[in-house]
Amino acid sequence: TRECTSTLVLEGRCRLAFKLLRAYQNEFRGVCCTPGALSFYRADYVRSVADEWLSQRFRGQPCTTGEDRAIANLFLRDGWLTAYQENAKVYSKMPATFAGMCRMFLRWARSNIRETVFLFSFLFRRFRGAYLNTFRFNMVLATMSLILPPLLIAGNIGALFASDGYVFHQYLAVMTYALSVAVIYYVNERDSDWVWLMIYEFVWVASLWWIIPYAFATLRNTGWLTRKVEAEPVGRVLRAQPVAC
């Protein structure tokens, strides 16, 4: 929901994750994270892996977050194709404070690291026929994008004092990247949210670069972090029912 600057920045982040990233992954039917907000799965397959999914553990701890990425990994491992429906519309409650936004990004980063480790346990097996090498190549690139940016930023911090004009050059590099993403988005969507995509890139470099390194250092922390109210217990088990599409 559009409540404040934080939620608008987060909307820009979601636009990037869906309109660009998942739309691209859809081209080779390899969406690696089917979003928990709205996804449809084959019920018979979910039943067959339900115990494995629900009892997943990582480094000795039960996995309580990232269940959407986890179920997508199971589908991919067993040869299913995953897709993104571009015209689906979902409304979600986002953190309205910077601290809440950081906690949410930490939760996402920890589960992303965990599920990337799981992904590599089968990535180089012949687990599917269609688009196999394309999927492998893109997952390796995605992993590099998870690891390299924090290392580059850490190196840049050390170089701040070594060269005159270094900050200005780095500012131009970030501006070029942010503008490129915004242009690609605008060409495809033709709306004003490209502005928030640009702002998100600057916010990430300036104040969120530490998220991934800290997530690596605190992988054993499995808390939800942004949930304020305890979920009410479900009185009965809801069985999956077929629906008309």
Predicted regions: what they are:
Residues 1-127:
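Non-transmembrane catalytic domains and loops of membrane-associated enzymes and transporters
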Residues 6, 38, 42, 172-177, ...:
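Transmembrane alpha-helices
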Residues 35, 43, 223-245:
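Short linear elements at protein peripheries
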Residues 74, 102-104, 133, 234-235, ...:
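Short alpha-helix boundary/capping motifs
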Residues 100, 104-110, 115, 196-236:
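Membrane-proximal soluble regions of multi-pass membrane proteins
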Residues 108-122, 130, 143-160:
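Short hydrophobic alpha-helical module
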Residues 127-144, 238-245:
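Loop-to-transmembrane boundary segments
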Residues 137-223:
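Membrane-embedded multi-pass helical conduit in multi-pass membrane proteins
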